[in-house]
């Protein structure tokens, strides 16, 4: 933490303490002037999504209501929503951050950017559009669903960039292949966000669409998508440390971890105007990547999101994250990127059934060997026995939004 970052943090602390909101109460006993080092800052309490829910509807705002130009809300489907207010400065800053993401991906004002994530209260679609407009590129604001229209506009508008969830990008790739229109598609790049995806899925989408792919990261509480993205070298995601301060903590103890160790990402906003966040626990699992990127950019890097602390399932005493399953599937010969895991409890024991798509199901011997290999890898790498099930390509459901991979029916 350099002096400039510390000064920005102290300015934000002063602002939130002066407002009559959540942080004023949480930080009431904190003397801002006493925070002189990184270690002093790390003594401050964390904030959680539950805290933000308790501030509903506008308890996070530290500016007068007349300065709030819009709100967005998290996409969670349970409980009280989290409302994040934005000033015009916040909107402009977000557009600048997203523009940087596009530039890192090699996208220019000559591109035509087809935007398929949702609009409305969600930050997804409008964030992609803000960045496109700031860049000067043509936005094609399709929104989610209506695959027929998506593919028609992709051809008619000769879109060069696809913005989508990985699940929907795969669905579009499969539909384009089925319809035999790949030669009429002019896509060059895909900017993919909103859900974690593995290398096998990345390879399928890149191959079937014939595009370069870029992971984009963000969350509604912190602007939205557009706060980090990988470059052409794909050695982690660059994030913008002039706007955001990242920490990686042990999710159990809250201890700040050394660079390179896997843990939970915690974000402090340095310039957020309407609703600053101090030490916000994202529950996203990643690590800081040290050293200079081959691209030469000075923005620091984190690894791709490997899962969430709340995505973890425990089976027979073993903690399992979706990222671990992705890594296993990647190494299974003839396995597609698509899988689903069902967990239930039978005869006093937990049972884990793993369905994986493959194109060898018509060959009984090959299918049997495939399932045997899958079972062996799970036992060797995670230490859990599974019931392996090979299914045909396309048997598992596709989604226009985020895909659910793990279904736990024990509780």
Report the location of each language-model feature.
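Active-site phosphate/ATP/adenylate-binding loop shared across adenylate-forming ligases
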Residues: 43, 47-214, 222, 226-232, ...
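Conserved AMP-binding/adenylate-forming
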Residues: 197-292
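Nucleotide 5′-phosphate-binding alpha/beta core
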Residues: 1-73, 78-96, 100-104, 108, ...
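AMP-binding/adenylate-forming catalytic core of the ANL superfamily
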Residues: 162, 271-382, 401
């Amino acid at each position: 933490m350099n002096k400039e970052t510390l000064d920005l943090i102290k300015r934000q602390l002063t602002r939130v303490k002066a407002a009559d909101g959540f942080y004023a109460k949480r930080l009431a006993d904190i003397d801002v002037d006493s925070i002189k080092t990184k270690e002093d800052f790390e003594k401050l309490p964390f904030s959680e999504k539950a805290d933000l829910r308790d501030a509903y509807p506008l308890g996070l705002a530290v500016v007068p209501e007349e300065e709030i130009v819009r709100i967005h809300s998290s996409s969670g489907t349970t409980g009280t929503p989290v409302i994040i207010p934005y000033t015009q400065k916040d909107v402009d800053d977000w557009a600048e951050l997203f523009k940087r993401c596009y530039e890192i991906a090699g996208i220019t004002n000559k591109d035509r950017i087809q935007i398929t994530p949702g609009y409305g209260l969600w930050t997804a679609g409008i964030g992609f559009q803000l960045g496109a407009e700031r860049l000067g590129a043509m936005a094609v604001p399709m929104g989610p669903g209506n695959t027929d229209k998506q593919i028609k506009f992709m051809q008619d508008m000769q879109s060069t960039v696809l913005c989508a969830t990985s699940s929907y990008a795969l669905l579009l790739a499969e539909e384009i292949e089925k319809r035999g229109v790949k030669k009429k598609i002019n896509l060059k790049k895909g900017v993919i966000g909103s859900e974690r995806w593995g290398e096998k899925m990345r390879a399928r989408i890149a191959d079937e669409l014939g595009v370069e792919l870029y992971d984009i990261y963000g969350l509604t509480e912190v602007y939205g998508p557009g706060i980090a993205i990988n470059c052409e070298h794909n050695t982690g995601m660059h994030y913008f440390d002039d706007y955001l301060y990242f920490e990686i903590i042990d999710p159990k103890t809250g201890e700040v971890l050394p660079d390179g160790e896997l843990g939970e990402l915690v974000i402090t906003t340095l310039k957020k105007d309407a609703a600053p966040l101090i030490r916000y626990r994202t529950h996203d699992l990643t690590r800081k990547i040290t050293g200079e990127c081959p691209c030469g950019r000075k923005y620091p890097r984190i690894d791709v999101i490997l899962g969430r602390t709340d995505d973890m399932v425990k089976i027979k005493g073993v903690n399992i994250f979706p990222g671990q399953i992705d890594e296993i599937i990647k190494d299974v010969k003839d396995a597609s990127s698509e899988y689903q895991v069902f967990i239930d409890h039978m005869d006093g024991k937990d049972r884990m059934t793993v369905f994986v798509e493959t194109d060898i199901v018509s060959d009984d011997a090959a299918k049997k060997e495939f399932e045997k290999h899958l079972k062996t890898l799970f036992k060797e790498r995670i230490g859990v026995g599974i019931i392996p099930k090979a299914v045909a390509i396309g048997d598992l459901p596709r989604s226009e939004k985020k895909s659910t991979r793990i279904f736990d029916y024990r509780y």
